[in-house]
Amino acid sequence: MICIGIDVAKDKHDCCILDSDGTIRADCITIPNNMDGFKQLLQTIRDCTKKSDKIKVGLEATGHYSYNILGFLLDNGLPTYVINPLHTNLYRNSLSLRKTKTDRVDARTIATMLLSDVDLKSYTDTAYHNEELKSLTRYRFDKVRERAKLKQSVSRLVTILFPELEKLVPSLHIASVYALLSEYPGAKQISEIHLTKLTNLLATASKGRYGKDKAIQIRDAARTSIGSVMPAKFLELKHTIKLIRELTSEIDEIEVSIQKIMDELNPPILSIPGVGIQSAAMILAEIGDFSNFESPDKILAYAGCSPSTYQSGKLTNCYAHMEKRGSRYLRYALYNTTKYVCHWNPVFAEYLAKKRAEGKHYNVALSHATKKLVRLIYALQKSGKAYLVAA
């Protein structure tokens, strides 16, 4: 058995190679983060091993820094283990009382961790390509949050420039309102528009939903508006709406790419009422290979949804707060999906109502429903069977 620990960094990687006896075959080699460095590492591994040797390569999950070297190792057929940094930190502290942490020490710790035969599962080629879906879903998540902040800015600016408008439309964030404000961002400008022009603008943007009556209503409100005349805010509002439109176009493009992958996967969890394409994609992308998890509880822990526990002597915590460690994207996807599932699925709606009847806070009851949903998702994905709605 040959164990290779790699401490990943931005510009260089530190490597340590141990054999099954714990003897150092190559101590703390430093390679640059480029193709020459990767080839140097591969050659060093070949020089230190025989064809009959079983090889394990371990590295920490360091996000985008580890992505390229991970792909190189997998392409060259080396069994690679991606380890949670929390685990390596705890393991290193268990080996020594000294607070020594260097790249070389980390590389040796990872190699020793592999040698100790702790319960680790190798990173599969399927998991590597699953990163494509994860990249898309996380990218969409960030874009949606960015757009939400811009929408808040629109609401703030409208409150300053034309506060009466919000009561005349179902939402400020609809095509007809954006079309109006992108051309006439203030109440004073809207009040001076010719009625025919305003009617045509609203009718075109709303696809016929709004006509002359709505145009008169908006123009009359603009003429008596308390909105301020601030050219700087006018410009900010027009630019903000432009950015929202661009982000919406980008999000639509991302969703098309996600849809293509999900059409190929056709996962069983889509058969659960209330689970949509985007939510399912994020859940699957963050969990990855379900065989890496022995039980649904492991997935909950990975998402940081498990209750934290604290006990010392006679002291035991009365209110177990959520751990909130692990993937925040998975935690977000699970909780938001649970809300929709509880709305559309009678079984989950009844379960949520039961927990609420027991006196639990809504968020606590929802966390119980989330655990139930994770158990269902785990069962469906492991069995490959679709969800059957009870008659």
Where are these regions (language model features)?
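A detector of single, family-specific signature residues
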Residues: M1-A391
